[in-house]
């Protein structure tokens, strides 16, 4: 499929070249192959790549969760070698790369890692900010505010790579111990990463079915699956969050974590390498072992009981995002500098 996309873009580029178009600079995400042959059309153009991730057979994420290990471990390195061929085909043509986090940049081979600048896409901290009087309408419960005990959990798709199974398995105890809590879960039913569920099923429903019998009807009524939300509504969700839970394999760091921190949320997160770039334990959030659902719930409940700690962690989290990830003050100027350096280098 990558070659098919590359060929289609090559033909479109040739048509543009024949009309006199000649770019000085090409910026591309190489992951789907569109940029494979562009410098064959425009040999003098500089090519900069968005380096999201280089897949390695034994690190960082593929063998992380034994419950969802590869069914064919002997051939997994072969599959990944083929998957990475696209990266290697780009390395020779590219002049430089940019990665949003050190963790992602460090997955790349050293020969190309030396050409990668770490610069995040950036968070608009003027939009993602604390808002004391915010209200969020949730079907079945009316308006929720910061006066309510709201626990939030966000995935693009509800799946094991982002710890959905760990969170769901911890729900029965959380609902039992926190009788006033509302749990707001954001995410779709598909798969973004990792193994697909059995035919005709979704990870969302599989883990609902696993825990549903442990949760009384009245408690289950306090769990709200919101699907995907428009961005403004999503920010309001983060702004009312009393504790935000973020779980992920050692993988691409979710923008939603940084947005939650920018909104001043108190975060409980998995203690994995990409998360540790932004969360220092008990400074900008609290870290727990990814697989330890009991510790996760203890950390959540402890923060729900400690308003002073929540305020301190949320204040520190927002300060870190503003200092290192602010779109307009930090990241966009660095991106412009990177483009200028690429163009003139």
What are these regions (language model features)?
Residues 1, 44-85, 126, 130-131, ...:
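Acceptor-binding helix/loop patch of EC 2.4 sugar-transfer enzymes
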Residues 266-269, 279:
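Short hydrophobic beta-strand element within catalytic cores of glycosyltransferases
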Residues 281-282, 286-293, 302-308:
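Conserved acidic donor-binding segment of nucleotide-sugar-dependent glycosyltransferases
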Residues 3-4, 308-344:
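A charged, aromatic-enriched C-terminal amphipathic alpha-helix characteristic of glycosyltransferases
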Residues 191, 195-228:
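Nucleotide-activated donor-binding/catalytic signature segment of Leloir-type glycosyltransferases, i.e.
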Residues 137-162, 168-173, 183-184:
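Conserved donor-binding/catalytic core segment of Leloir-type glycosyltransferases
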Residues 249:
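Aromatic "clamp/platform" in nucleotide-sugar-dependent glycosyltransferases that forms part
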Residues 56, 68-148:
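Donor nucleotide-sugar binding/catalytic pocket of nucleotide-sugar-dependent glycosyltransferases
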């Amino acid at each position: 499929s990558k070659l098919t996309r590359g060929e289609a873009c090559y033909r479109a580029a040739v048509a543009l070249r024949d009309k006199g178009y000649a770019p000085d600079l090409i910026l591309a995400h190489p992951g789907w192959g569109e940029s494979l042959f562009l410098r064959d059309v425009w040999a003098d153009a500089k090519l900069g790549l968005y380096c999201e991730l280089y897949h390695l057979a034994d690190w960082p994420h593929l063998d992380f969760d034994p419950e969802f290990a590869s069914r064919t471990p002997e051939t997994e390195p072969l599959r990944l070698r083929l998957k990475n061929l696209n990266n290697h085909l780009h390395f020779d043509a590219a002049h430089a790369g940019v990665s949003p986090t050190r963790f992602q940049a460090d997955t790349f081979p050293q020969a190309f890692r030396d050409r990668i600048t770490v610069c995040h896409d950036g968070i608009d901290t003027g939009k993602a900010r604390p808002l004391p009087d915010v209200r969020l309408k949730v079907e079945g419960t009316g308006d929720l505010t910061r006066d309510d005990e709201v626990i939030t959990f966000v995935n693009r798709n509800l799946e094991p790579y982002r710890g959905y199974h760990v969170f769901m398995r911890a729900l029965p105890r959380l609902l039992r111990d926190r009788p006033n809590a509302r749990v707001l879960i954001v995410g779709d039913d598909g798969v973004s990463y990792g193994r697909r569920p059995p035919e005709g099923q979704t990870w969302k429903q599989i883990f609902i079915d696993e825990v549903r019998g442990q949760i009384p009807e009245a408690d289950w009524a306090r769990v709200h699956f919101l699907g995907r939300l428009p961005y403004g509504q999503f920010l309001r969700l983060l702004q009312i969050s009393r504790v935000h839970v973020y779980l992920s394999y050692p993988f691409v760091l979710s923008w939603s974590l940084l947005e939650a921190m920018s909104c001043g949320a108190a975060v409980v997160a998995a203690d994995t390498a990409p998360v540790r770039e932004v969360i220092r334990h008990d400074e900008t959030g609290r870290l727990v072992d990814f697989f330890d659902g009991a510790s996760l719930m203890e950390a959540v409940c402890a923060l729900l009981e400690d308003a002073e700690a929540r305020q301190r962690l949320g204040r520190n989290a927002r300060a870190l995002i503003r200092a290192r990830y602010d779109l307009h003050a930090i990241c966009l100027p660095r991106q412009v500098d990177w483009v200028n350096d690429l163009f003139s280098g």
